[in-house]
Regions:
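Secondary-structure boundary/capping signal
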Residues: 19, 23, 39-40, 71, ...
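A short N-terminal interaction module
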Residues: 1-55, 59
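Conserved SAM/SAH cofactor-binding pocket of Class I
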Residues: 98-193
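Conserved AdoMet
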Residues: 34-108
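Non-catalytic, surface-exposed connector residues within folded enzymatic/regulatory domains
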Residues: 22-26, 53, 75, 96, ...
Length: 195
């Protein structure tokens, strides 16, 4: 059996040429918290605790996937946004920290209804619903993305009116006070530099 300290060393040794040290450290502790439930300080306290072979193998799978430049959020199938847990997969984009600023800005406004266009994971409407008593709707053209968004709403205990619709060919939108959309804004040429 391996120890927690061995797992930490394994991440560092295997990924030091793949990413900068700070990113490797972040991946390490996010993965440990995901699989073992340990915070960074728990890792110090439990450095000599045994890790089962199954869990050790899972850490190795994570490292292998990181070496292919697959984002950790997709490997784990989840991310955090606005202090909430969200499922993510290949049908959704990973919420960006800048989008939290957009949510902050919207929450400063008084409103009783809002619509998110191109919802993806549902992170914007779910964060709004967790922090404001309002009727929130969300539209996406992708049924697969809406499936993830519905799961995220359930996980976070909020009700959102999810609508499968192509915003470009439909004018049948809910009447709301606020409309928000945060479509992808990374250029195709920039994608390679992100990973």
């Amino acid at each position: 059996m391996e120890k927690v300290s061995n797992i930490i060393g394994y991440f560092k040794d295997e990924l030091s040429e793949v990413a900068k040290e700070g990113e490797v450290v972040s991946w390490t502790y996010i993965s440990i918290e995901y699989l073992l439930g340990y915070t960074r300080s728990d890792c110090i306290i439990n450095a000599n605790r045994d890790v089962s072979k199954d869990v050790s193998d899972r850490f190795k799978q994570i490292v292998s996937a990181l070496k292919t430049n697959k984002p950790l959020q997709y490997i784990l199938g989840e991310t955090e946004f606005y202090g909430l847990k969200f499922k993510v997969n290949e049908y959704t984009l990973i919420p960006r920290p800048e989008t939290e600023e957009l949510v902050d800005w919207i929450l400063k406004e008084e409103f009783s209804s809002a619509l998110d266009i191109g919802t993806g994971t549902g992170c914007i409407p779910i964060a709004l619903a967790k922090n404001k008593k309002a009727v929130i709707s969300a539209i996406d053209i992708s049924n697969n993305a809406l499936l993830v968004a519905r799961q995220n709403a359930k996980i976070n205990g909020v009700e959102i009116n999810f609508i499968h619709q192509d915003i470009l060919i439909s004018n049948d939108l809910p009447k709301v006070e606020i409309i928000v959309s945060n479509p992808p804004y990374v250029l195709e040429s920039e994608k390679e530099m992100m990973f």
